[in-house]
C-alpha cells in the first residue's frame, strides 16, 4: 500500500444552456453526477483516498455551471478557478 494520500477531485459541472450546446456536446450534468457518485464510492473503498466535491460549489440555482464561473459553459473562468483553488487549499 502506498503511503501517499490521494485526493480524488469531482468532475466539474457544465452549463447545458442552448448557447453552449456545441461546446458542451455530449456532456450532461446527469452523467457527471453519476460519475462523481462512482468516484465517491471508489474513495470510500480505499483508506488513503479522499473525495473532494468541487462540483456542488460551482452550481447555480438551477443546477448548471454558474455563469460567473465559466467562459463557455465548459471551461472555468478566473472566478471558477478561484473556487477550485479554495477547495483544494481546504483539502490540502
For each of these PLM feature ranges, what is it?
Residues 16-53:
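Substrate-gating cap/lid alpha-helix
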Residues 69-92:
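Histidine-centered active-site loop/cap adjacent to the catalytic His
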Residues 12-16, 56-60:
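Solvent-exposed loop/turn segments at secondary-structure junctions
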Residues 18-22, 64-69:
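Short acidic, glycine/proline-rich loop/turn micro-motifs
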Residues 41, 50, 61, 66-68:
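Short, functionally important structural connectors and interaction interfaces within domains
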Residues 7-10:
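Alpha/beta-hydrolase-fold catalytic nucleophile elbow
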Residues 38-45, 57, 61, 87-91:
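Structured segments of extracytoplasmic/periplasmic soluble domains
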Residues 1-5:
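A short helix->loop->beta-strand "cap" motif at the edges of active sites that frequently abuts
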